[in-house]
Amino acid sequence: MTFQKQPPFVWRKPPKGDRISYVKYAIFALIFFLTCYYSAYSIAQLHNYRIIIPEHGGQYLPFHPAWTLVYISIYIAQALTLLAVRSKEECLAWSQSLCYSVGMATVIFVLFPTEQPPVEHLKELSGQWMDLYWVTATTSTKANAFPSLHVASMLCTVWYSTQEKPRWFSLLMYAWFLAVAYSTVVLREHYLVDVLGGIVVAWLAIMFSQKKLRGKSVDNSCTLKKPQP
């Protein structure tokens, strides 16, 4: 597999013959995430060992429930990735990067379960965004704060969505990533150190997925160049 020079595009429909593969890759990544995420949570409930991060040294920011909209916008970004990647192989690499992120994070969740920032005192607050905040918060589990899987998966998504894209588009996508990362802290889902951990996990996941993508490209190139009898 080699990437042929294509006219610049931001989003486009996948090639007709590859659309099912795109959807399968996305569904597999989702199922892998749900399986690992809730399995790690179940294991954490078997013991009381927890790592507590001290709330000082700039580890948290003031609470702003309106940022819930930005927090959940990651799902829009992931859906749009199916329109942004350049090929079926690149879509597979994106899916693999998500799975690598989840796999690495799950090991850490099991071995070093880290508690999220406390939110009990937020129950006293009211406002137009609080209902949405609590609905979103109920989907999260405990003892999996470090690293931030939300940050890791968003960075993988943005990276694969911006390959050979216009500069303005890449800047907007990375600004979107920063906004999502910021939202995890102001919504008291994570500490700043969790965000940094998520970035490291994403970097490793992208590196591993790219290595497999390049290896597949070399193999296919050799097959194409093989002389016919």
PLM segments and residue spans:
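Hydrophobic faces of alpha-helical transmembrane segments in multi-pass integral membrane proteins
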Residues: 28, 32, 36, 96, ...
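Aromatic-anchored segments of alpha-helical transmembrane domains
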Residues: 34-39, 102-111, 175-186
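Membrane-interface loops
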Residues: 41-57, 86-169, 216-217, 221-225
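Membrane-interfacial alpha-helical segments at the cytosolic side of multi-pass membrane proteins
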Residues: 76-83, 151-173, 199-209
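Interfacial helix-loop-helix junctions of multi-pass membrane proteins
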Residues: 123, 141-146, 179-206
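C-terminal membrane module of polytopic membrane proteins
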Residues: 187, 197-229
